[in-house]
């Protein structure tokens, strides 16, 4: 890509840019280290969130932001859902103590289980299980295994594909699932395009079995459907059938989409994924969960079947009839939604993913990426991540908090989540890689029409409280840890040496208009030369964006560490429409607008000197994360913080 012509446009572009910021996909600052102390903005925000939830639950008529709309959840409805909410951080172990618990009267008066939920209360986690299934596969399977066609793994599918190979017609593209093109990875990414429900119990004809006096013809008349026989459903009417019977029951179902077309949620896919993993490893999924994840992370209150000991039963959250909910048999559905866990254990699980405790760091980074888009600009899909693209408050409209200038950036933060909602239980785990933190919610209620919406409402309140606080805390720590003047030894001691080099790091002083938030270089003298005034930067005070950290955990940082930053001199917006609205010359659409929305990733590391990028700055940090010196890499000279 030829960029020299666009470099010349930089001064004029900077004059026109206004609005919100789009950086690399990643943090604006190093991740915050303090989420739990009395001085932490995150802890303060959590306290405010807890007060908000307390007030909400005490008001039996309405909650915050409620109106006359019939879709608004009342406090009474929220109060009827038991839930446990908790934070965690790979940098601050005490963050896991930030929790909020509410026990509904249904659970408080239940005949079985706990009557007051806490961090060690055991919930069913429903489809959050799918995240454990994929991680279990990543820990026990090779890349070759993940990319093998299912017909080479599951014999029944191979036989079906062979038996129907000679009957291929144009109609088969619509009615025949291409099992030889579907891999375990396609199932994990929800891109297989297969039928959603594999269990025959999800079929309307099952109503005939449940109510024999109402025949299939009556059902057909009620729904306007043609007559059918219950025997057409096959032998696998519930999740406790064998894997072979299950596969035979689903292999002839028509697909929803062709493989690798568009994400389509399928419980059936994760049942098949569990079958495939078990066949490839020779282990049942329950053994993989226990040995590869639960034991490895000391998740001592997590299970693949309902716990039955006296101690665990007393901690179990049981809504409604245990046989229909909490203790319902998993069968083949274990890999789709059969696990049990607690707030405490899920904090360990979330930290382990963020910290690459079980997987190599490179494998974790590869895994925590989108594999497909949805039709929405704010949601994407991974394996099996449900990725929420959270947009921080716009600095032009955020005026309510004293930290607004630090947290209101308008930037995008990707939340890697996995939800669950089945039977009497809902759940969600939210991982935020750029902050090394996250949170979980577990909930229970027999009122299925309310439980899911309540869970999502609490998640919205949590997200809107925690994300700005994490950004503001990261900004506050960055100011303390990096802002200041860095000088060469001869400059600071006024020796007779001719070396005269210094660098000043400031906050919110960048002259990249519209992108002036965060750390920046306000002055840079190298061997007596004003580098910012030189053609390298054209008089612009660049922003500094963190790129690589040498150590992440608190234990590793105790011996000191390094963090690399890239200098950014280009204006950015978070979409081309915003660039056009800002009046940038020549922006008419997505292609003319790409220079003002994604110029950083297009031009990063463009200019080198002696084999090193001139935009690379490496800071030395002490055990507290505070910078002690910086090396502008191209200058090959370390400057000490004064």
Question: For each predicted feature, which ranges?
Answer:
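Glycine-rich His-Gly loop
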Residues: 127, 192, 443
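Residue-level detector of alpha-helical secondary structure
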Residues: 52-56, 136, 292
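Fungal secretory targeting signals
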Residues: 1-22
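Short active-site loop at a secondary-structure junction
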Residues: 41-44, 71-84, 109-187, 255-268, ...
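Short, surface-exposed loop or secondary-structure junction motifs
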Residues: 78-81, 90-93, 101-110, 162-429
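Residues at alpha-helix boundaries and the short loops/turns that link adjacent helices
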Residues: 131, 143-144, 279, 283, ...
